[in-house]
């Protein structure tokens, strides 16, 4: 009886949001899911287009007023806290608007929490990193958007409300200290930390100025992909061009060891092998 709440917070990243919606729709998990899009741009609200408006799994919330202070938001932690108020699932995935979620991401995450039901969180040991110079690689990092967590525990431990960022460490530190985050070596990357976008689509990367005392406003000033029309999904061919890069990376990485970790043929066959059919 799992319901997976994919929760996206966003500000002036219109093209990224369209791509991310499409990646949600292309998840191959057969089960209950929802995508909450929490937009804090009060000048350019997000509206689902005709193709998306009939999909009951997708919900857009346009709001720039902190539910606790009744003032405009001044940090991402408060935004994430308010965004999960709209989630109705049992489990939470931070669906970062500018990153890449491969078709098996949710399915593998659910497989993980089923294997380790006493855990509050699960993640694959390795994800991937798409650098700004176009280099795509297997990468190990905390990468909170690669984690699936019990939503009740996320609500209980919350987010750091600080302008510099690092908001996930409020819950993440507790999970790690209590050994309730399972980092699974028997896994395959399903998420990519993406710095490859260029031009207006790239905008500002908050992780690039992490802990700057005014990181929140730097991000707002540097992100200008305005919503000037309704949201529509990416085409199948556009998505497939992205997916094929990862298929090549993962296929070429089978049985190669990275600090004791390796992608097995079994996991490739289980999760990746049908990648060419996910966008039909």
Residue ranges of model-derived segments:
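Short, acidic, metal-binding catalytic loop of nucleotide-sugar glycosyltransferases
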Residues: 22-32
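Short beta-strand/loop segment that forms part of the nucleotide-sugar
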Residues: 32-43, 61-66
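Short aromatic/hydrophobic "clamp" motif used to bind/position activated sugar donors
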Residues: 92
């Amino acid at each position: 009886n799992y319901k997976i709440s994919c929760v996206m917070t966003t500000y002036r990243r219109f093209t990224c949001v369209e791509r991310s919606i499409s990646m949600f729709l292309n998840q191959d998990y057969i089960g209950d899911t929802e995508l909450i899009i929490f937009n804090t741009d009060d000048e350019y609200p997000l509206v689902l287009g005709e193709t998306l408006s009939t999909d009951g799994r997708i919900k857009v919330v346009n709001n720039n007023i902190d539910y606790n202070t009744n003032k405009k938001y001044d940090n991402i932690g408060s935004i994430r806290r308010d965004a999960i108020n709209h989630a109705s699932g049992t489990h939470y995935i931070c669906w970062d608007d500018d990153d890449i979620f491969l078709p098996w991401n949710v399915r593998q995450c659910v497989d993980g929490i089923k294997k380790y039901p006493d855990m509050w969180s699960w993640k694959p040991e390795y994800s991937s990193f798409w650098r700004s110079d176009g280099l795509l690689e297997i990468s190990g990092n905390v990468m909170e958007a690669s984690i699936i967590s019990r939503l009740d525990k996320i609500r209980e431990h919350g987010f750091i409300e600080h302008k510099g960022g690092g908001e996930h460490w409020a819950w993440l530190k507790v999970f790690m200290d209590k050994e309730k985050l399972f980092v699974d070596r028997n896994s395959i990357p399903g998420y990519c930390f993406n710095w490859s976008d260029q031009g207006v689509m790239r905008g500002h990367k908050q992780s690039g100025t992490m802990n700057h005392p005014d990181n929140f406003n730097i991000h707002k000033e540097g992100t200008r992909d305005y919503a000037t029309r309704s949201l529509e999904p990416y085409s199948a061919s556009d998505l497939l061009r992205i997916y094929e890069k990862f298929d090549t990376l993962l296929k070429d990485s089978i049985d190669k060891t990275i600090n004791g970790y390796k992608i097995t043929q079994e996991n490739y066959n289980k999760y990746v092998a049908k990648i060419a059919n996910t966008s039909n």
